[in-house]
Every structure is written in C-alpha cells, then in structure tokens.
Amino acid sequence: VGFKAGVKDYKLTYYTPDYETKDTDILAAFRVSPQPGVPPEEAGAAVAAESSTGTWTTVWTDGLTSLDRYKGRCYHIEPVAGEENQYIAYVAYPLDLFEEGSVTNMFTSIVGNVFGFKALRALRLEDLRIPPAYAKTFQGPPHGIQVERDKLNKYGRPLLGCTIKPKLGLSAKNYGRAVYECLRGGLDFTKDDENVNSQPFMRWRDRFLFCAEAIYKAQAETGEIKGHYLNATAGTCEEMIKRAVFARELGVPIVMHDYLTGGFTANTSLAHYCRDNGLLLHIHRAMHAVIDRQKNHGIHFRVLAKALRMSGGDHIHSGTVVGKLEGEREITLGFVDLLRDDFIEKDRSRGIYFTQDWVSLPGVLPVASGGIHVWHMPALTEIFGDDSVLQFGGGTLGHPWGNAPGAVANRVALEACVQARNEGRDLAREGNEIIREASKWSPELAAA
C-alpha cells in the first residue's frame, strides 16, 4: 500500500467505539458542541486526534511510528440530556503520550490545542481519570491531611481560618497586628490574600517577619499551634523559592501559592520544596473562574482540583456550597471527595464521570471561603465534615467589637456545632438553635 496524501475524516482513524479501555489509559470526558452540520463522531474523533498524534492531513512520517500504539481514541459518545446538539465524548489516551510527574505536560497535551478547533462551537473538559500508573509518578501534596493534623495537634473538628482585610494597603506592622488578634481569639490560621505578594506599601520580607512574630506570640498565649499562610507567589520561580526558604528559616508552619496564576511547574517545584522542608502548602485558585465558569466551554474545576492533588498542595479553595442551588451542592461535594478520599466511585449525579483510584496519594483539605459567617457554621460543619478548613474573612474582621472577638465568635460557634453533632443532634434542622444556645455563654458570639 503506497502512501496516500490528502485530508481525511478523523473518524476513520480516531473514532473506535469497540475499543476496550486499558487500566493504564488516561481517560477524558469532553462536553462537545459541534458546529452545525458536523456529526458528533467526527467532532469527538477530531478532539482525540488533535490532542494526541493527529494533524489535519496524512503525513509521510505517520509511517515511521505506530499510530495504533500512540493515538488518542474517542471510544464513546452520548448526547447530553436536555441540551440540543451537545455531546459527551469519551477519549482514551495511551500512557506513553505523557511525561511522568508533569501536570504541565498533561494539560499541554490534553487541552493545549483543541479548544480553538474550527469544527467545534465550544469544548469543555468535564473530567479526567488518572490511572494509578500515572498517579504514582507524582509526589502529590507535601504532607496531606493526616500529617497536617499531627503537625498541628488538632483533631476531630474542621480548622478555622481568616483572610486578613483590607487585603491591600496595610503596613506590615498593622497587618501583623490583625494576624495576632485573630489567632489569639481562637482561629487556627490566618491568610494572606491571593494578591498580596510584595507591593510598595508592604514588602514580603517585612510581612513575613511581623506575621511570624504574631504567630509566636499567639502560640505562647493560647498553648495551641498557629499558622499564617504566607503567600510565596512571585514573578519568578527563583523568587518564590527564596520566599519559601525565608519562611522556613522563621520556623513558621505553612506557606501559600496561587497555583493557576503561578503555573503548575512553579507549583510542583514549591510542593517538592515544602515536603523536603516540613512546610505545609496552602493553595489559592485565583483565576479559576476564567477557566471553569462557562458551562459549555473551558475546564471543570474538578479537573483543576485533581491536577492540584497531583502537582501538590495541602489545602485548596473549593467553594462554599452554602446558599447555592441544591445541584451545585452535590457537584461540589463530588470534587471535595476527589480531593480528600483515596478511592472515589463513578457517580454522574455528582459530576464524577470516572472511578478514580489515587493509590494512597495524600489527600488535600478543601477550604470553604467567601461570604460565610457564623450562622453558616452548622451547615458548613455538616456538609464538609471534619476534614476541611472554614475561612471567615469579613465574618471575623467584620465583628462589631473587632478582630479578636470575631475570632472568638467563630471558634465558639464551631465547637458548639461539633459538640452538638457528636451528641447526635441534627445540624441541618437545629443549626440556628445550637448557635443561639451557645451565644448565651459567649457575648462575642451573641454580638456577631
């Protein structure tokens, strides 16, 4: 058979409905919206081709490799219920297409090029199945949930945090003071805002020093281990590591990184440094909505969450669930479990397209943050359970009596909810009552 040039249909090569997926394949679920007149099989096959071995035409060099061994395959297509001309295309990628231990390379391959494809109106990556063989090439979170609890000596309850506000404009000294008040009042952690890096009004080194002072003072006075997420995010990887090194020299327990704006390569480097040096790593997802907000285009956050667990982080922001729609709650809990658990069953009602086995990669604590306050505490305790970080920014600093009483109010509310739950009370039904009872004993909570 001679070599035959020319453009050909992708589906002839890349649509293989009878393919049996291998345990080592990376599986992807894409939400495909084809252009009018493009059949779904062709659209699904085009995605498989462009994100693996294909190009728009047959090339002579195809004969020098084994396409069967290296090509992505669209092995199943199903229409999306209730949506016109929208399909879920399942694609299987051979493991050899990806560099070991590189989230960066995985994304470059799977989502690098296909999203601008002419034959598609829109494309969204809904889920990825990471095979154990690939997961094992990643270090993952620097420490994970269990090690973090042992380091902090805090068990049987969610952890409490607070983002220091106003996020921009405070001097380092005043910033450290706010940190001290919150930790002294009863929080476990305070947090640099994601856009606090090293600006003219507060350089990073000054902030690190005053926050460390606040941590040590609060620890001495409360007898509890405290932390402040020192944001090490910087303009270069070298500068980021320099800040992490300084944090380690100060002896603080945790640093922070913006993993999407900072990039996966920088994040993985920082995660490796953190494991080697006993630092916990808090991850903020600034920029995620740019990627995950559109329902029919982009990447679903559950994929970004899986990628973070592979790249490495001990905490990650994951939405609050409270006050959102019922469906959102199930979807959010789906990726919260993907972050924490070792083995997660496929469950389409929670948006989980594939069974995921993490083979003992450490878990990540989900962080609920943004617009929550003490009256949400029962719901948050019930929804997220013990393995979570609950962050009240304005909900702490907005207390009429100040920061420390705001922290006291949150801690009292949390302890009351945990105690009530352990006594078998129904937090969903009696939540407000539980908070009201607790506020009889805590003027700070009553004032909140």
UniProtKB/Swiss-Prot annotation:
Pfam families listed in its UniProt record: RuBisCO_large, RuBisCO_large_N
Site residues by UniProt (Transition state stabilizer): 324
GO terms (BP aspect): photorespiration; reductive pentose-phosphate cycle
Residues engaged in binding Mg(2+): 191, 193-194
Enzyme Commission number, as recorded: 4.1.1.39
Top-level taxonomic group: Eukaryota
Assigned keywords, A-Z: Calvin cycle, Carbon dioxide fixation, Chloroplast, Disulfide bond, Lyase, Magnesium, Metal-binding, Methylation, Monooxygenase, Oxidoreductase, Photorespiration, Photosynthesis, Plastid
Modified residues (N6-carboxylysine): 191
Quaternary structure and interacting proteins, as annotated: Heterohexadecamer of 8 large chains and 8 small chains; disulfide-linked. The disulfide link is formed within the large subunit homodimers.
Function: RuBisCO catalyzes two reactions: the carboxylation of D-ribulose 1,5-bisphosphate, the primary event in carbon dioxide fixation, as well as the oxidative fragmentation of the pentose substrate in the photorespiration process. Both reactions occur simultaneously and in competition at the same active site.
Name used for this protein in its record: Ribulose bisphosphate carboxylase large chain
Gene source species: Eucryphia lucida (Leatherwood)
